[in-house]
Regions:
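N-terminal export/assembly leaders
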Residues: 250-257
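Class I Rossmann-like S-adenosyl-L-methionine
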Residues: 240, 253, 290-292
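Catalytic cores of RNA-modifying enzymes
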Residues: 4, 8-228, 248, 265, ...
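Primarily a LysM-type cell-wall glycan-binding module
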Residues: 233
């Protein structure tokens, strides 16, 4: 009984220590910080990297390390990027194993080729809600460096990324990410496991690079076209595409193609590739006429 009592006191001391740690860094609204407080969910998120290639891991926005503590137990090198100087100081104090692997910078401004000396890595984190889309656009810029990405984001954004054509949530992120990655919606997370609780539910997803190495179209035009038509998603393509031809008049039958009567959420990634080639060919023809 005395032994059990000592165990109980030790458990209580550990619990109090965790509570003190939870209060060590105050969440900052301007950084979109919502600290995860459920250790079980943190471990589940950390375990999502196990299905990724056996590569180093980069965690974005570790905060107070609730996810980090499980990542560093895995047989992979781990680095963490944190913009909040208070969190960086906390991590240095509480995770001495990370040593020089805590990077106190803005992820969105970083050259990701220098993180692991040009080697590929897995991206993960409890991503700041206000910049999650920007994080994934950055991931796409370094898609050959990041074969796998996991983590937690707003449920709404997760649904958009995982949505299929014909779904109302299908949009810019859906097309651009699914062009290069296979997407898995893993599980939903309630609001009450965060400090402070966000106003929306969250979700954990995993994105794994597919076998596509070349879209078969002009990638810059593809991205521009996708963003253009989804910014007017309720309009037919023949209407929204006109702004891509300033000062130019496409041939008479250009807008009568069957695809032009559809709305952007009805097109698959492959159909967007075909549309890009269709639009690109017309732009080249018109430019040649203009220069002749």
């Amino acid at each position: 009984r005395q032994f059990e009592s000592k165990l109980s006191l030790r458990s209580l001391a550990l619990s109090l220590q965790k509570i003190r740690h939870m209060k060590a860094v105050k969440p900052k609204k301007n950084l979109g910080q919502h600290f995860l407080t459920d250790l079980g969910i943190a471990k589940r998120i950390a375990d999502t990297v196990d299905a990724c290639p056996d590569l180093p891991v980069l965690e974005i926005g570790p905060g107070m390390g609730v996810l980090t503590q499980y990542l560093i137990e895995k047989p992979r090198p781990v680095k963490a990027v944190e913009i909040d100087s208070e969190s960086v100081a906390y991590l240095h104090e509480n995770f001495p194993r990370l040593k020089d692997n805590i990077i106190g910078e803005d992820f969105l401004r970083m050259d990701l080729t220098r993180i692991f000396d040009g080697r590929q890595f897995v991206l993960t984190g409890n991503y700041p809600y206000d910049i999650s889309s920007q994080i994934f656009f950055k991931m796409l810029d370094y898609k050959d460096l990041i074969p796998c990405c996991t983590g937690m984001i707003q449920r709404e954004v997760a649904l958009r990324i995982a949505s299929e054509p014909g779904n109302k949530a299908y949009g810019i992120l859906s097309v651009l990410i699914q062009a290069w990655y296979s997407v898995e919606y893993l599980f939903t997370v309630d609001e009450n496991v965060f400090n402070p609780p966000p106003k929306v539910k969250s979700a954990v997803i995993r994105m794994t690079r597919n076998e596509v190495t070349d879209l078969g179209c002009d990638e810059l035009l593809f991205k521009r076209l996708v963003k253009t038509v989804f910014n007017q998603r309720r309009k037919m393509l023949r209407v929204s595409l006109k702004q891509m031809f300033p000062g130019l008049t496409p041939r008479e039958d250009f807008y009568t193609a069957d695809v032009m009567t559809r709305r952007p959420e009805q097109l698959s990634v492959q159909e967007f590739v075909e549309l890009t080639n269709y639009v690109g060919a017309e732009l080249e023809r018109l430019q040649a006429e203009k220069n002749s």
